[in-house]
A protein has these predicted regions:
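Solvent-exposed, acidic/flexible segments
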Residues: 74-78, 113-121, 152-156, 184-195
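Bacterial N-terminal signal peptides that target proteins for export
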Residues: 2-11
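C-terminal/domain-edge helix-coil "capping" segments
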Residues: 24-63, 127-131, 143, 155-160, ...
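Extracytoplasmic/secreted cell-surface and envelope-processing proteins
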Residues: 146-151
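N-terminal segment of the mature soluble domain
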Residues: 62-138, 172-175
Length: 223
């Protein structure tokens, strides 16, 4: 009887230990996951706002070749847009890096100082001539003060992208605003994932943005 009691006690101890070890394993796994999440950075795109398309009589242009100018305040975002536009439309898109390499220094300086759609309209004809394109997409990113997030381990940076598409003749064809938030951890943003998210965002809202009216037909959708 005493031996049986000892056996039962031993089994109880082993069972309790197994549960405790399993719990510790789960806690350790959760700790690793939380630590990794705390280090990661990401970008969240909100809904487009204040979209506008030129009336039919002003947008009778064929946008076969487009250039994406370096965005004021965020060069990387301009590169993302160039990549995504080449995937989302059937147009030939020239990247900001190539635009910069083909422009004289004084024009590049003007680009960095551009703050309004009128500045972009004034610059578009010269850029279009120098790069041989039918239109230029301009962008300007304005940010708000960063906020602490994830118990102070990350920074949350709300930002807004102002977009202007101007024809080679200096006609404003389309404009919109895209609010987005960058959450900064110790790791850099996964740019491929961010571009996939942006592609999905654009193709999902292409019609309501007025791209169909401009002849910018979406030819790819993100999976």
């Amino acid at each position: 009887m005493r031996i049986r009691f000892r056996q039962i006690s031993l089994l109880g101890i082993l069972f309790s230990s197994a549960i405790l070890m399993q719990s510790c394993g789960v806690l350790a796994w959760l700790g690793i996951v939380c630590a990794d999440v705390a280090r990661c950075s990401d970008v969240k795109f909100e809904s487009f706002e204040h979209s506008w398309v030129a009336p039919p009589e002003e947008r009778q242009v064929h946008l076969e070749h487009l250039a994406v100018a370096p965005f004021v305040g965020d060069i990387r975002m301009a590169e993302w847009w160039a990549t995504v536009l080449s995937q989302a439309t059937d147009r030939h898109v020239i990247s900001p890096a190539e635009v910069s390499s083909r422009l004289p220094p004084n024009v590049l300086t003007q680009l960095t100082q551009s703050t309004t759609d009128q500045d972009d309209i004034a610059l578009a004809p010269q850029l279009s001539r120098d790069i041989q394109v039918d239109g230029v997409l301009f962008g300007r990113v304005v940010g708000e003060p960063p906020q602490k997030a994830f118990w102070g381990l990350k920074e949350r940076c709300p930002q807004r992208l102002f977009l202007h598409l101007v024809s080679a003749e200096g006609i404003l064809l389309w404009k919109a605003e895209l609010p987005f938030t960058v959450v900064k951890g110790k790791k850099e943003v996964d740019e491929e994932m961010a571009k996939r998210d942006l592609l999905t965002h654009i193709t999902t809202h292409a019609k309501e943005l007025g791209w169909t009216e401009l002849g910018l037909v979406a030819v790819h959708t993100a999976s």
